[in-house]
Amino acid sequence: MLKSGFSALAAVTLFCAGAMQLAGQSTTNQDHNEGFFTRLGHAYINDWTASSNGLPPAPEPQRRGTPAPLNSPPFPSADWPIGGTPVIGAPDYQTYMLMQAINKNETRFKVYGWFSIGYNASTSNKGKYANAPMAYDVIPNSIQLDQAALYFERLPDTVQKEHFDWGFRFASIYGLDYRYTTAAGVFSQQLLQKNNTYGYDPVMYYMDFYLPHIGQGTDIRLGRYISLPDIEAQLAPNNYTYSHSLLYTYDCYTQHGINATTRLNNHWTVQAGVSGGCEAAPWSKYAKLTGNACAGYTWSNGGDNLYFCANSLNSAKYSYNNVSAYYLTYYRKFNETWHTSTEYWYQYERDVPNLCYGLDPCISYGPNANIGAHASQITSPALISGANGAQCNPAATHCYAPDWAIVNYIEHEWNNHHTSMTIRNEFFDDLKGQRTGTATKYSEHLVGLNYWIGSTVTFRPELRLEHSYDKPAYDAPTGGAPTKTTQLTFAGDLIWHF
């Protein structure tokens, strides 16, 4: 499976490169006489040896509104994260080596991607996925292809306010990380029926429609997109660290729907939309009409941002990841080299099947949560494959399953934007065990580095310690219950951008 999926992505990449090689005819005579791979090699050499990250210095692109608060690299983005939209008023800062080889990055249509390969050494070792509830490096003491990603993209021009513009993105990943992005109804048999270690997921496919005369610019996004809130994201380069916080691991990942984002002024941005729910395609039997409403407030000339988001508004009745979730995120820039990000959420599901029904004592099976239940004795709604039940009073067949979490990042950069350090601390309370499979409180602490070679090669080593306070939650053997309350991992990944 790994070989065939990897070959498919490689074939698509080479096909695009070969098909678009003729675009190089518009370059200089020297470029015209060079082959595609020669131009690609020169692009990487220029990226690694230029005095700035990427190509030799060029005029700063025009921007509307407050200045970008961060440097990217070494940070994932120059702007504070906001989902469901491009950053209205921000230019397209990115150049890509593949497009430099094809047409010197002279068009707004782009093909790009990356390979992310990760490793970890862990104190857990009893089962194939024994690092759970940690993600995405869930297989202990191993080296894995986390993501091979390929993007086709055109960004709308939201800097100008004169005319309508449009954009799109079609993004695919292959690798271990598909296990976290899979949506019911979108090639989901790979995970929900076959439980494949590696798989393919078209993680984003959407259109953007930019309307410049509504507020100070409005973007309407239609399709499958990353859920709106969160400091972190599913795609490897969009994160400070290799591993993800527990807070991020157990909330909503993607949605199929329509979302409108309006920039009212330099301070306020508002969002509203509808979708089929978290990780459920509209044609899936698990789809539920779901609303979202968010608002962001920026001050200190872009240095502070407060972002509130009700990301999934519906009945919250148990289904495939049908959580109702409310987020509050605060971003603060201290100076040119230090900033912090803090996120809190509360989420819940109703009428969740009780894994402890008729069982006293009730054993927590962690990532194997549903195997311990008297499933045949639980009336509708029944347990769903890939959606944990809860651990409640043994006399109840169903119950309310809430959880809450908070995470803080402290970030520092140096070495002329080539290196950054991350300190992450979080607390997560899975009150009924519905998210992780174990009803317990967790803490997680991480120190990581982010080192860039130019703007195309990233290395992210980290040391992470986590603990479950009420019962064992780590190192579960295949088909068995967790055996440890503490887990220590040394991990990292290498991202090669093209």
Regions found by a protein language model. Give the residues of each.
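Acidic/histidine-rich, surface-exposed loop or edge segments in extracytoplasmic proteins
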Residues: 131
